Structures are given as C-alpha cells and as structure tokens.
C-alpha cells in the first residue's frame, strides 16, 4: 500500500472517529437535558403536592420523611367530592352576599332614602339578581377559557419539546448507524488494498474482458505504427532506387546531397552529445512524418511533432499491463502536449520512465 493511500485511509479514520465523538456528545447532551426536564417536572409536582397538603385539609399526605411527601391517590376522589360540595356552599353564600350588597347599593339613594322595594319578589330585585348572575357567568367563562388556553399552550409546547428531543435522538441513531457503515467500508477498503498489494486480486469476467480488449487495442496501435514505419522505409527505398538509376544519366544534385550529409551529421551529433545512450536506445528521427522514436528499458516512445510542437505521444510495451501503459500515455500527453522543448520531454522520460512498471506521478 502506498504512503498516499495509507495517509488517505488514516484521514478517513480520523474523520469518522471525530464524527462519532461529536454524535456521542450530542446524544449525551440530549439525554442529560431530558433527565433534567424530568427531574424538574417531578420537583414541581412534589412542591405542588406539599403546598396542597399544607393548604388543604381535604388532602392527607403520607409523610415518610421531610424530603419525601406523598399523597394516596385513592383518597383523591372522595376529597374532590367533598371539596365540590363545600365549593357549592361557598358559591351560594357568596352569591347571597353579593346579591345583598348589590341590592343595598342600588336601593339606597343619595339622600339615604330607601327605594320602594318591599321584598325579593320585586321585579327590580329580580332584574338586578339576573344581571349579577350573568356577570358572574361571563367572568367564569372568561377564566375557564383562559385556563383552557393555557393548558393547550402548555400541552403544545411540551409536545414540541418531546418531538424535538425524539427527532434529535433519531438523527443521532441514524448518524451512529452511518458511522458503523463507514467503519465497515473502511475495513473493506483496507482488506481490498492489502489483497491488491499481495497481488491476489481476482478479476471478474467483465473486468478481465476489458483488460483483454485494452491489450488487443494496444497491439493494434503498435501494428499501425509499424505499418507507418514500414511505409516510410519503403518510400525511402524507392527514392534511393530512383536516385541510383538516374545517377548515371544526369549531374548529381549537390543541394540534395548537402542536405543529406547535413542531416546525417546532425543526427549523429545529437545521438552522441545530447542523448544518454545508457538509458536511451534505438533513437530514430523521421523528418517526413515528423516523428521521433526511441526506447527506454522495455518501452518504446514515439513523439509526433506538428508545427514545432508535440502533438501526440505514444507508448508501446508488451510486458507492461494495458491499464498502466494507458495511464502513463495519458499522463505524458497531459504534461507535454503542445510543448516545443523536446529535450525536456526526453529528459523527463529517462528519469521518470526508466522502470516501465511504475506509473508516472
């Protein structure tokens, strides 16, 4: 496994570990908050029980100690019934007192003279009593509506808090499950890379067919290149034959001869002065096709030059896997396509491509 792969895998593991720690922290905070809310609600209920027990003789507490006060719920129904009866008595008494108060208020004039109301059967007394009853009912309805509204708000807010907590817990659970899946995938990746390093990877039928197709395609490209070389050599042979046949019938072309000698001298000088023959073998120049061919180790490199710039780079190697050869070809074309410095390309290849199995990085 390469250092880059190991560092990447270690980075994945660190990210998963940090995410797991954050998820555990959030889950713990939610549980702590829920426990705090539960204890707070129990404390409020406990204080309410104590207050009811202290202020209401109908509720009899069971005192175990000073810190724990409990109420027997079996006696609540009887106490509530007694309390309702007492409330009715108080209500009647209150109404009588309020009626009497209103009666006196409306029947006494500014000059302290009593109005002519003989008894409670008087129509004016009945009307005033009815108005008092209506006001009382309206006030009670208003208070009951407020109580119902407050109860509804409390229930709604409590439901929202519970739903939010449940949603957070569900999200934490999903994230935890996702983290577990990530760990599983990371372990599978480590196993796959270990198996790959050991060279024990078995290719599936589809991938094996693809590799064979790439190999056949590589051979076809090499065949086309050899055909092109053969065509160039055949054209050169024909040209030389024509020159030889016509050499006895006409004066020699001094300009062509001079160009030929100059080309051979430049070719020889470049091979001797600029090429490291310990690394580069079989250097050939093809001016007619604009190509340069040489071999490093077991790989043949063909550089196509068009308009003083490299237009294409081809690699041929029967011993190198087709996928690695394709990757090296793509990398070289990506690096040097369009450049005019052929020497820099050759130097790079001799230094980086001396071992054909290693891909270019």
Curated annotation (Swiss-Prot):
<keyword id="KW-0539">Nucleus</keyword>
<feature type="coiled-coil region">
    <location>
        <begin position="220"/>
        <end position="246"/>
    </location>
</feature>
<feature type="coiled-coil region">
    <location>
        <begin position="126"/>
        <end position="160"/>
    </location>
</feature>
<dbReference type="Pfam" id="PF17097">
    <property type="entry name" value="Kre28"/>
</dbReference>
<dbReference type="GO" id="GO:1905325">
    <property type="term" value="P:regulation of meiosis I spindle assembly checkpoint"/>
</dbReference>
<keyword id="KW-0137">Centromere</keyword>
<protein>
    <recommendedName>
        <fullName>Outer kinetochore KNL1 complex subunit KRE28</fullName>
    </recommendedName>
</protein>
<comment type="function">
    <text>Acts as a component of the outer kinetochore KNL1 complex that facilitates microtubule-kinetochore interactions and the spindle assembly checkpoint. Kinetochores, consisting of a centromere-associated inner segment and a microtubule-contacting outer segment, play a crucial role in chromosome segregation by mediating the physical connection between centromeric DNA and spindle microtubules.</text>
</comment>
<dbReference type="InterPro" id="IPR031361">
    <property type="entry name" value="Kre28"/>
</dbReference>
<dbReference type="GO" id="GO:0005634">
    <property type="term" value="C:nucleus"/>
</dbReference>
<dbReference type="GO" id="GO:0000776">
    <property type="term" value="C:kinetochore"/>
</dbReference>
<comment type="similarity">
    <text>Belongs to the KRE28 family.</text>
</comment>
<keyword id="KW-0175">Coiled coil</keyword>
<keyword id="KW-0158">Chromosome</keyword>
<dbReference type="GO" id="GO:0180019">
    <property type="term" value="C:Knl1/Spc105 complex"/>
</dbReference>
<dbReference type="GO" id="GO:0031619">
    <property type="term" value="P:homologous chromosome orientation in meiotic metaphase I"/>
</dbReference>
<comment type="subunit">
    <text>Component of the KNL1/SPC105 complex composed of SPC105 and KRE28. Part of the ten-subunit outer kinetochore KMN network that includes the KNL1, MIS12 and NDC80 complexes.</text>
</comment>
<keyword id="KW-0995">Kinetochore</keyword>
